[in-house]
């Protein structure tokens, strides 16, 4: 039987943090800032604000190599009555941090001539091409659908400008489901993610949605491979990664030590184990937008390969393309207005709201510098995942990857 720990019980049983730190003496003012950051994380674990975290940083030269693990990977004690520590190889549900991996897989297909960025998806995703746009509902409550204006391209999918949205984020789709036009998924199923209709035309606006789940299907159809097989052969094998997978339930060695999902109870502020189906099962197919489990160190290998432009995953010129703003002026303005009006969502990670932002192939891009506590530099690419996973990458400076596992942005109770 699982035994549960409240936040005040965590304090006396916190696993010792582990660290590796090389090269910070070469960075002005970093020593004090790093100590302050580490103290903040130690305090957050001790007071039960978070169960555990992993923080990593690398630079392109290899001189900077920083890793620090804090706390535990769960609030549930093991059979020895201990809290198992959070480690760099702890398998973690990446959620939307999966989107970077699927973007890389799609761009590999582009490099190999299997698809073009500006090619319509008609050939590989005819089911998406046939999808109509939901405009609203008539007096009888029936959905009003219209034909899509324009064609969806791979670039639209990679930049969230295809006209698709997640059900939980869009009022029309929430009403569409409430009226019985979508079935509530009883399990973690791909069709429930791909079934909702579009809510706008391609290129009309930035909308966060199931674009990378569809991109994963595009990669499968372009290559003839299951996305898990493609991931293993084209991302994991080149980087010697052995703990990254869509199929955690088929890997008992990883399943036994994965990070648990937790949420914060609003009534008492304590962390609770969350027995979410999303965290204890695999999808019926591979979700390109949210389906991967990985250890932090393995995810770091991926982003560090991009940072080094080493050609093992993508050509240097393709990596450079990822860092170029991909939205036109009107869509960029609309995206910024939407995000400013929805600070509680904070898509993909903590991009400060005061920054002007765009979107590239794989993440959000800062269009200006910001100093101080919310430091960012123009051109940095960032995204993450719902369980408080954040990665930030600069081609010419530090690149951080954060792994926090304590509660979903939308899931406190």
Swiss-Prot record:
Give the pathway annotation. Polyketide biosynthesis; lovastatin biosynthesis
Stimuli inducing this protein: Expression is controlled by the monacolin K cluster transcription regulator mokH.
UniProt GO MF annotations: acyltransferase activity; hydrolase activity
Acyltransferase among keywords: yes
The UniProt entry, under Pfam families, shows: Beta-lactamase (PF00144)
Q: Does the keyword Acyltransferase apply?
A: yes
Q: Under which EC number(s) is this enzyme classified?
A: 2.3.1.238
| Cited InterPro entries | Beta-lactam-related (IPR001466), Beta-lactam/transpept-like (IPR012338), Diverse_Enzym_Activities (IPR050789)
Which residues take part in binding 2-methylbutanoate?
386
In the UniProt entry, which residues are flagged as the active site?
A: 96
Keywords on record: Acyltransferase, Hydrolase, Transferase
Instruction: Give the EC class as a word.
Output: transferase
User: In which domain of life is the source organism classified?
Assistant: Eukaryota
For the ligand (monacolin J), the binding residues are: 93, 193, 208, 278
What is it used for?
Monacoline K acts as an inhibitor of HMG-CoA reductase involved in cholesterogenesis. Its hypocholesterolemic activity might be useful for lowering cholesterol levels in the blood and reduce artherosclerosis and coronary heart disease.
This enzyme catalyses: monacolin J carboxylate + (S)-2-methylbutanoyl-[2-methylbutanoate polyketide synthase] = lovastatin carboxylate + holo-[2-methylbutanoate polyketide synthase]
> Main role?
Acyltransferase; part of the gene cluster that mediates the biosynthesis of monakolin K, also known as lovastatin, and which acts as a potent competitive inhibitor of HMG-CoA reductase. Monakolin K biosynthesis is performed in two stages. The first stage is catalyzed by the nonaketide synthase mokA, which belongs to type I polyketide synthases and catalyzes the iterative nine-step formation of the polyketide.
Q: Which family does it belong to?
A: Belongs to the class-A beta-lactamase family.
**What is this protein called in UniProt?**
Acyltransferase mokF
Recorded source organism is Monascus pilosus
